[in-house]
């Protein structure tokens, strides 16, 4: 049970990456937090037990991932996955940038992360450079109103 700013009290399902058959086929995600079908998987170097034991240390990240849980519930996780992962081919990923802008805007609003840091993160290799900075700024502004 986590009490996350902007979400209230939530029952989050956090599991080790090894429990996901899908993540076994996506080793490039091992260093990132990943949310699939309402389940949050911490990076490979961190266990679900460690996340539970250190609770508030991960609140802003869990709040960010909780936004993705809501997005997947709203769209269905197969559609979310299609938009987030597959439709960027051959280049750019405006849907990925949109999903991340909403989640990072939540972090900025409720946890004090700067908008600059959020845009830098979204426009980085972590997200495979999904969109031009000006577009990500526009998306962030839409969510931060």
Q: Where are the regions that the model predicts?
A:
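Metalloprotease/metallohydrolase-associated module, dominated by Zn2+-dependent proteases
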Residues: 4, 23-31, 80-145
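Short pre-active-site segment immediately N-terminal to the catalytic Zn-binding motif
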Residues: 40-62
């Amino acid at each position: 049970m986590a009490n996350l700013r902007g979400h209230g009290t939530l029952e989050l399902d956090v599991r080790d990456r090894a429990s996901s058959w899908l993540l076994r086929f996506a080793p490039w995600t091992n260093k990132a937090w990943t949310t699939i079908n309402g389940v949050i998987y911490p990076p490979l170097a961190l266990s679900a037990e460690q996340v539970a034991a250190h609770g508030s240390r991960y609140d802003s990240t869990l709040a960010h991932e909780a936004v993705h849980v809501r997005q997947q519930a709203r769209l269905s996780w197969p559609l979310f996955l299609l938009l987030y992962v597959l439709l960027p081919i051959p280049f750019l990923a405006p849907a990925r940038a949109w999903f991340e802008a909403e989640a990072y805007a939540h972090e900025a609003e409720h946890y004090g992360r700067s908008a600059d840091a959020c845009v830098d993160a979204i426009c980085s290799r972590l997200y495979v450079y999904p969109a031009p900075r000006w577009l990500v700024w526009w998306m962030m502004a839409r969510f931060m109103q």
